[in-house]
């Protein structure tokens, strides 16, 4: 049965899920297929953190951080995060950048500025946004909300493969333990806990290929009467 969700002139598809569920890859491929803009919300926080370090802005200088976030020139493409036109995908994964991201995100005005930047990615012809609270907090009016799930074992295997391909060593048992601990933290946190929106489509990717997951998202989008 076709959905009665109203058409939005600038449609948004949200793809949320836990770490290593495949949401980033699926989101990028769906966006590429539709010719939509792409938002990697997790990378956005790290990009802001990296920029604050490069421009010498202290983690406690709230006003300067807010202005920096407002002025950032950021672009996302499949597997690539660009800051001021330069690919910094590897730079933002550094532990120091992650620590800085956590340090600046404790400030309410900084979080508000980051939320505003995320919503500003909504531009014609449309947006695919991936993260943890895209469908519940950032884009509650999205035309399609997808929540990807996968077993912890499947996600640990994927993450291990990703790290090995990038030349990093990793112990799969340690990765599995870390994923389970992070799942517990994300699901139980007070602010924007990791959970599907009430109207989200659930997609278990444990036994699906990337192409199969992308095809399912596109099928759901077409079923809404949207061109795909």
UniProtKB/Swiss-Prot annotation:
GO molecular function, one term: ATP binding
EC number: 2.7.4.25
Cellular compartment(s): Cytoplasm
UniProt xrefs under Pfam families: Cytidylate_kin
Gene3D superfamilies: P-loop containing nucleotide triphosphate hydrolases
Reactions catalysed according to its record: CMP + ATP = CDP + ADP; dCMP + ATP = dCDP + ADP
Sequence positions that bind ATP: 17-25
Gene Ontology, cellular component aspect: cytosol
InterPro entries: Cytidylate_kin (IPR003136), Cytidylate_kinase_dom (IPR011994), P-loop_NTPase (IPR027417)
Record-annotated membrane-spanning stretches: none
GO terms of biological process kind: nucleobase-containing small molecule interconversion; pyrimidine nucleotide metabolic process
UniProtKB keywords: ATP-binding, Cytoplasm, Kinase, Nucleotide-binding, Transferase
HAMAP family listed in its UniProt record: Cytidyl_kinase_type1
Name under which the protein is recorded: Cytidylate kinase
Native organism: Burkholderia cenocepacia (strain ATCC BAA-245 / DSM 16553 / LMG 16656 / NCTC 13227 / J2315 / CF5610)
Gene symbol of the encoding locus: cmk
């Amino acid at each position: 049965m076709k959905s009665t969700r109203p058409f939005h002139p600038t449609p948004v598809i949200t793809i949320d899920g836990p770490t290593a569920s495949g949401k980033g890859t699926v989101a990028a491929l769906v966006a590429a297929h539709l010719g939509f803009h792409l938002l990697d919300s997790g990378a956005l926080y790290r990009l802001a953190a990296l920029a604050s370090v490069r421009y010498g802005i202290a983690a406690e200088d709230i006003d300067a951080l807010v202005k920096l976030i407002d002025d950032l020139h950021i672009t996302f493409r499949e597997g690539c995060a660009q800051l001021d036109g330069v690919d910094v995908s590897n730079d933002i994964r550094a532990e120091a950048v992650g620590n800085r991201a956590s340090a600046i995100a404790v400030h309410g005005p900084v979080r508000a500025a980051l939320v505003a930047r995320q919503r500003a990615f909504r531009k014609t012809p449309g947006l695919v946004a991936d993260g943890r609270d895209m469908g519940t907090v950032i884009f509650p009016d999205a035309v399609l909300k997808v929540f990807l799930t996968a077993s912890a074992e499947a996600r640990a295997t994927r993450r291990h493969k990703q790290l090995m391909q990038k030349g990093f060593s990793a112990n799969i048992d340690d990765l599995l333990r870390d994923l389970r601990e992070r799942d517990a933290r994300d699901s139980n946190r007070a602010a924007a806990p990791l959970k599907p929106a009430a109207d989200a489509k659930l997609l278990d990717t444990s036994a699906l290929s990337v192409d199969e997951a992308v095809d399912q998202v596109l099928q759901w989008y077409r079923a809404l009467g949207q061109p795909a």
